[in-house]
């Protein structure tokens, strides 16, 4: 908004917007150009080298599915003058081992996040997000909210960028006061939310069905409140409240440090099974 759309490019697995005059690039870690010699390659006029490189949410290096990409960027992504890695404090101990010469700093949340207990869907305050897992459950809750409360926007990772952005705009402009979403709202979206309610704390993570970890709950609950505006979180629709110690950890932003990052060689040998096994995912 400050620089204008002609100065900023966007690359994700779904979108590629590269204005000819762009000098700033926002992208997912999987899509970002790494290495000083890597060109964008589409004639958009973007530089091959970047003065500044920032990687956000580096705690995801501990995620089994995407972690190896974040670890690769931690090891190899560098700006000419400055490189910044942003994320949860839980990643700091491992980052200190990997980057012994880096300077570390921290910023406290400017607003208070507090637990508001359990509320029925019909009793949730306006400007709330209701978080569920599974397409059917999200649409079922959204339809109920539309009938009982007058309207709801829907945000899921599997929506097309255009549809997802339209739903976010619908909520942000105040056309509806409720948002029903998956944990896709936990990262990459800054929304004017006063309250986040979990309708479920169980998700399928690609390998198994499990409960959310306290850190994952905090990532979602932390969408409530913005800047100096306090926020609340709770449960709804039959979801059991978290344990008291989990609530306390979320309110105080206090979690166990990540013990392992995932790593995979960027030079995978597809010539033999032995070569693939030797370069398979490992913990570091």
Name every feature range the model reports, one short phrase each:
Residues 3-37:
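Inter-Walker segment of RecA-like/P-loop motor cores
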Residues 213-248:
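Conserved segment of the helicase C-terminal RecA-like domain
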Residues 84-85, 125-145:
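Conserved strand-helix element at the start of the C-terminal RecA-like helicase core
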Residues 35-38, 59-71, 189-192:
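Conserved ATPase-coupling elements of RecA-like P-loop NTPase cores
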Residues 177, 183-227:
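Conserved RecA-like helicase motor core of SF1/SF2 enzymes
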Residues 282-284:
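Conserved small/polar residues in nucleotide/adenosyl-binding loops
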Residues 160-181:
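Conserved helicase ATPase core of P-loop NTP-dependent helicases/translocases
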Residues 60-110:
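Post-DEXD/H (motif II) to motif III coupling segment of the RecA-like Helicase ATP-binding lobe
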């Amino acid at each position: 908004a400050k620089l204008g759309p002609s100065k900023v490019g966007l690359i994700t697995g779904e979108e590629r917007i590269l204005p000819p005059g762009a000098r700033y690039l926002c992208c997912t870690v999987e899509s970002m150009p790494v290495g000083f010699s890597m060109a964008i390659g589409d004639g958009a006029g973007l530089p091959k080298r970047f003065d500044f490189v920032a990687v956000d949410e580096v705690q995801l290096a501990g995620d089994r599915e995407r972690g190896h990409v974040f670890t690769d960027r931690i090891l190899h992504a560098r700006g000419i003058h400055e490189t910044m890695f942003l994320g949860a404090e839980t990643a700091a101990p491992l980052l200190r081992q990997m980057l012994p010469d880096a300077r570390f700093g921290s910023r406290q949340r400017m607003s208070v996040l507090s637990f508001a207990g359990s509320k029925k869907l019909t009793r949730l305050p306006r400007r709330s997000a209701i978080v569920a897992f599974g397409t059917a459950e999200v649409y079922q809750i959204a339809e109920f909210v539309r009938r009982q409360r007058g309207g709801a926007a829907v945000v899921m990772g599997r929506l097309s960028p255009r549809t997802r952005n339209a739903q976010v705009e619908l909520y942000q402009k105040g056309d509806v006061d409720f948002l029903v979403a998956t944990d896709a709202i936990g990262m990459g979206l800054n929304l004017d939310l006063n309250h986040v309610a979990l309708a479920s704390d169980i998700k399928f993570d690609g390998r198994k069905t499990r409960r959310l970890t306290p850190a994952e709950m905090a990532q979602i609950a932390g969408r409530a409140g913005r800047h100096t505006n306090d926020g609340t979180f709770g449960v709804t629709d039959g979801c059991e409240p978290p344990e008291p110690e989990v609530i306390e950890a979320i309110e105080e932003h206090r979690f166990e440090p990540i013990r392992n990052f995932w790593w995979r060689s960027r030079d995978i040998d597809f010539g033999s099974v032995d070569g693939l096994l030797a370069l398979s995912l490992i913990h570091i």
